[in-house]
């Protein structure tokens, strides 16, 4: 849908990094819907480990950018419960590896609530988390579990590969009425590309086709599409 390099001089788009596109999506959705809030470790005054939430605490205050202790299962549960009550939490987990600490809340609660209550309750929450390998991090910080979660009924998994998709898919995930695992990749956080201004939303489940051919189909996601 969008190039992984900037062509903004010839278009109405804005040249942004993946990080900036994510931040723009969060800011726009929080301004658009008072029910959207962010919760996670160091997301407030420290502005997040990778600065995705930079400026949001100052703009929206502590009620909508909520600091959490190092207790992933606890604040994941807060996200699930508040989503069931009508809010739209964006839960930031510092690394995908730490989602395992809260896996009971994700798999047995967030993903199952709609089925357990016959469709009468929904869990409109987003779990934002970076992952990927090749960054010379520890063994517990270098794993990719998206395949696990893609097999969980009721859970949607999103893995953008360009800044435009980062913005458009995050906005779509926040508006979705089911839980979405939004997987970011550390390697492409600083990747720059053209990002449409305004209310740009990319539908979840619609694959981007960067190159059309006739003989072979290669399917990939996240960093694998830009290597």
Language model feature labels by segment:
Residues 1-14:
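Single conserved hydrophobic/aromatic residue that forms the stacking wall/gate
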Residues 7-8, 117, 208:
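Short secondary-structure boundary/capping segments
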Residues 9, 150, 210-211:
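Short, flexible turn/loop "capping" segments at secondary-structure junctions
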Residues 21-25, 167-179, 190-227:
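Glycine-/acidic-rich phosphate or pyrophosphate-binding loops and their flanking alpha/beta elements
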Residues 12-179, 183, 187:
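Thiamine diphosphate
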Residues 5-6, 156, 218:
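Short, flexible active-site loop motifs that bind/organize anionic cofactors or intermediates
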């Amino acid at each position: 849908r969008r190039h992984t390099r900037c062509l903004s001089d010839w278009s109405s788009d804005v040249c942004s990094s993946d990080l900036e596109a994510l931040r723009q999506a969060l800011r726009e959705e929080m301004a658009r819907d008072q029910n959207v809030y962010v919760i996670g470790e160091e997301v407030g005054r420290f502005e997040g480990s990778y600065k995705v939430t930079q400026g949001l605490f100052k703009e929206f205050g502590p009620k909508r950018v909520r600091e959490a202790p190092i207790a992933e299962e606890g604040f994941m549960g807060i996200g699930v419960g508040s989503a069931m009550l009508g809010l739209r939490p964006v839960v930031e987990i510092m690394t995908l590896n730490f989602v395992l600490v809260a896996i009971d809340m994700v798999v047995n609660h967030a993903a199952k609530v709609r089925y357990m209550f016959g469709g009468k309750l929904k869990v409109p929450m987003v779990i934002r988390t970076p992952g990927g390998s090749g960054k010379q991090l520890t063994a517990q910080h270098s794993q990719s579990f998206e395949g696990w979660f893609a097999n969980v009924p009721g859970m949607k998994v999103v893995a953008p590969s360009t800044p435009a998709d980062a913005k458009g898919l995050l906005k779509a995930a926040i508006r979705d009425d089911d839980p979405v695992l939004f997987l970011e990749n550390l390697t492409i956080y600083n990747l720059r590309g053209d990002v449409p201004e305004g209310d740009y939303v990319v539908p979840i489940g619609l694959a981007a086709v960067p190159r059309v051919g006739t003989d072979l189909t290669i399917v990939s996601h996240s960093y694998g599409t830009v290597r």
